[in-house]
């Protein structure tokens, strides 16, 4: 019944004051404000040397694992043009930050202790969650 009543009503557009034309002579109403977007010039990422073919990686006999000759392309081909490669790749650890010998942990005893405490906390927290949701807890 209500569907019949709703269908019989004639719908007309509302006269909103925002949709009415401007009464001033010579002034055109604007449907939207003018918006100008200006992009700033991007900063160039500076790297001491690009990594990859031509940037420190040397393949045995100049051939990669698939048997193709490395041309120094990929993201590293734009190092001279943009100051870095396309995606601004920067490795977390650079050769300047490496330990002189790989057999000494740079964090020392304090770092190892903190690592062990963190690992133990994660394992104990997981065990507590398993225990608290099991039938043994009730």
Swiss-Prot record:
Q: Which residues cross the membrane?
A: none
The record's similarity note reads:
Belongs to the psbR family.
Q: Is Thylakoid among the key words of this record?
A: yes
Q: State one Pfam family annotation.
A: PsbR
Q: Where is this chain primarily localised?
A: plastid
Record keywords: Transmembrane helix included? no
Any one GO biological process: photosynthesis
- Transit peptide limits: 1-39
Its taxonomic path starts at: Eukaryota, Viridiplantae, Streptophyta, Embryophyta, Tracheophyta
What name does the UniProt record give this protein? Answer: Photosystem II 10 kDa polypeptide, chloroplastic
- Identify the keywords attached in UniProt to this record, alphabetized: Chloroplast, Membrane, Photosynthesis, Photosystem II, Plastid, Thylakoid, Transit peptide
Organism expressing this protein natively: Hordeum vulgare
List the InterPro entries hit by this protein, alphabetically: PSII_PsbR (IPR006814)
Please give the GO cellular component terms listed in this UniProt entry: chloroplast thylakoid membrane; photosystem II oxygen evolving complex
Q: Where in the cell is it found?
A: Plastid, Chloroplast thylakoid membrane
Q: What does this protein do?
A: Associated with the oxygen-evolving complex of photosystem II.
